């Protein structure tokens, strides 16, 4: 009886939401469902929390271009199942 609500990811034809993949350098992939008009900062922060990282430690790129926190999937013309790449910042040379 706990499963009364319909599953969300079933109707991907609804153009209001988009499924995005975030691929880390270690080969890990995390999937997110986000509204096309939602700033990507929400996805970026959620990814950092899930991975235990700070926003200062990593950079997000889509099609090789840096993503700004204010960008939305609609602005970047992202399509369903597109992939965002994550790169760790290279800082300093000491341990």
Curated annotation (Swiss-Prot):
InterPro entries given in the database record: Rad60/SUMO-like_dom, Ubiquitin-like_dom, Ubiquitin-like_domsf
Propeptide boundaries: 94-95
Entry GO CC: nucleus
Record domain Ubiquitin-like: where: 16-95
Post-translational modification: Polymeric chains can be formed through Lys-11 cross-linking. Cleavage of precursor form by a sentrin-specific protease is necessary for function.
Gene3D superfamilies: Phosphatidylinositol 3-kinase Catalytic Subunit, Chain A, domain 1 (3.10.20.90)
Cross-link (Glycyl lysine isopeptide (Gly-Lys) (interchain with K-? in acceptor proteins)): 93
Positions of disulphide bridges: none
Stretches of the chain forming a coiled coil according to its record: none
Assembly with partners or alone: Interacts with sae2 and ube2i. Covalently attached to a number of proteins, including top2.
Family stated for the protein in its record: Belongs to the ubiquitin family. SUMO subfamily.
Name of protein: Small ubiquitin-related modifier 2-A
């Amino acid at each position: 009886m706990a499963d009364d609500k319909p599953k969300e990811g079933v109707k991907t034809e609804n153009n209001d939401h988009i499924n995005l993949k975030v691929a880390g350098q270690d080969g890990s992939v995390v999937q997110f469902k986000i509204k096309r008009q939602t700033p990507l900062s929400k996805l970026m922060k959620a990814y950092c929390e899930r991975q235990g990282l700070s926003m200062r430690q990593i950079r997000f790129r889509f099609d090789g271009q840096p993503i700004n926190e204010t960008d939305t999937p609609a602005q970047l013309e992202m399509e369903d199942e597109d992939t965002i790449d994550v790169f760790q910042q290279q800082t300093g040379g000491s341990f």
